[in-house]
Amino acid sequence: MKFERVEDLKEYLTQQCFTDTVVLESPSYISAVVGISTDGRLIYSRDLMVRHLCEQDGMTEQEADEFIDFNTEGALPNMGEKAPIIMEDL
C-alpha cells in the first residue's frame, strides 16, 4: 500500500491500532515507506529516502546520503521505542 500524504498514513496506522508509531514528517519520506514491523515500527527504504530528497529537494545523492546520516538516522535514538526502522536495500 502506498500513501500520497502523511495524514493518510497516520489515519491508516490509527485504524490498524498503531497509534504510537513514529512517522517521519520533516521531511516526510512518504514515498520511502515500505512496511511496518510486527512491533509497530514503520520501515523506510534508505534508497527510496535518498531518491525522495533528490527529487523533492533537488539534492545530489551524496548530499541526500549525508542529510539522512546526520539529520534522520542521528535523531532515531531520541524517537523512543517506536522509532522508525531505516532498511538498507540489498
Residues covered by each model-derived region:
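C-terminal alpha-helical interaction appendages
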Residues: K2-L90
